[in-house]
């Protein structure tokens, strides 16, 4: 049984995945397997990928899905193929940061045997800009409070590490369509009592570049024109209920308080960023439609919150919405690094 299973949900982008696998072959630690779930790729290169892996003598498991399962189901399927002690989740256009990444992670995880989830940092492949979602190295502990405090740190999937047996034990299709399956699993593992290990190390280079190849991105999508202001329910709407569901069996009488903390983080940090980003890549009207989709009657629909809590959170929603719709984008761009640092410092103190 290998120590690591590199779990990759695959759909097209085969050139990027082959390059990522080529770099895996260079790792000083070879105690790993690659687990690829192909979500009905249409580029016809599945056999080419497998042939490359065979010729490279890399241990791998490859399975093509019979139907398109989209992101959540495909990630769950990739984890389901794993047999290692730990699963390292990777996007199919991301790669490990350097040749000693697995060796470093192996030593750390052996010294922390109660780890259920580990989170690492990442940097941009082209620019080298580092995103420090973890600002120190250490054991954050376990339990529902730790899960509630940390769930936003796994929104980017690459470089998130799960204890394999627990990730497979918590497999569910309840949140298919949320595009945050890793967030549910991470929160559930930590809430049930396994440690969350934060690692201030860059383990991943994201968004690989290959000459003559390109990948689709949200920022490159054409603008809607005309763009009416109509309610648009995004995956963000499910975030609070998803994390609540993950911690619920272990929350006891504190569930409402945990749900309030979850929604406060969504409303103060995740939601305004999404609205401002929608204004940047689409339009003000498009962003306003997203705001309508997040209105309190939708946001609270899967939570049994007391009336007072709904009123207070609804008031916060209204204030944040107004701020996100009127703030100059130039001001947000200038303040974004500082706001990111503030959000991290707040969570470190809680």
Model-assigned labels for residue ranges:
Residues 38-47, 67, 95:
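A conserved acidic beta->alpha catalytic loop
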Residues 100-133:
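Conserved donor NDP-sugar-binding/catalytic core segment of glycosyltransferases
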Residues 179, 184-187, 191, 201-350:
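C-terminal subregions of glycosyltransferases and related glycan-biosynthesis enzymes
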Residues 65-82:
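Glycine-rich, basic loop-to-helix element that forms the pyrophosphate-binding segment
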């Amino acid at each position: 049984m290998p120590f690591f299973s590199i779990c990759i949900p695959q759909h097209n982008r085969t050139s990027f995945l082959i390059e990522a696998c080529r770099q895996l072959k260079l790792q000083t630690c070879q105690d790993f397997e690659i687990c690829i779930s192909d979500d009905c790729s249409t580029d016809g290169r599945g056999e080419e990928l497998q042939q490359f892996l065979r010729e490279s003598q890399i241990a791998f498991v490859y399975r093509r899905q019979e139907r398109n399962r989209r992101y959540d189901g495909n990630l769950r399927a990739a984890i389901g193929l794993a047999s290692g002690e730990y699963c390292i989740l990777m996007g199919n256009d991301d790669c490990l940061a350097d040749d000693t990444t697995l060796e470093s992670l192996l030593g750390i995880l052996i010294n922390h045997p109660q780890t259920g989830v580990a989170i690492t940092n990442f940097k941009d492949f082209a620019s080298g800009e580092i995103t420090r979602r973890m600002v120190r190295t250490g054991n954050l502990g376990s339990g529902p409070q730790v899960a509630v405090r940390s769930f936003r740190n796994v929104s980017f999937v690459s470089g998130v590490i799960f204890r394999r047996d627990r990730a497979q034990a918590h497999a569910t299709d309840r949140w298919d369509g949320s595009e945050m399956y890793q967030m549910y699993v991470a929160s559930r593992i930590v809430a049930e009592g396994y440690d969350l290990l934060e690692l201030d190390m860059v383990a991943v280079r994201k968004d690989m570049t290959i000459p003559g190849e390109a990948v689709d991105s949200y920022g490159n999508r054409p603008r809607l024109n005309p763009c009416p202001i109509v309610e648009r329910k995004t995956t963000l709407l499910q975030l609070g209920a998803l994390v609540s569901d993950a911690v619920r069996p272990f929350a006891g009488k504190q569930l409402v308080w945990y749900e309030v903390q979850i929604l406060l983080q969504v409303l103060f940090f995740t939601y305004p960023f999404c609205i401002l980003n929608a204004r940047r890549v689409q339009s003000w009207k498009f962003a306003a439609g997203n705001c309508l989709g997040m209105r309190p009657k939708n946001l609270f629909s899967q939570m049994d919150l007391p009336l007072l809590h709904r009123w207070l959170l609804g008031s916060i929603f209204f204030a944040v919405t107004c701020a996100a719709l009127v703030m100059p984008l130039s001001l947000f761009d200038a303040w974004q690094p500082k706001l990111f640092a503030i959000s991290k410092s707040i969570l470190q103190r809680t």
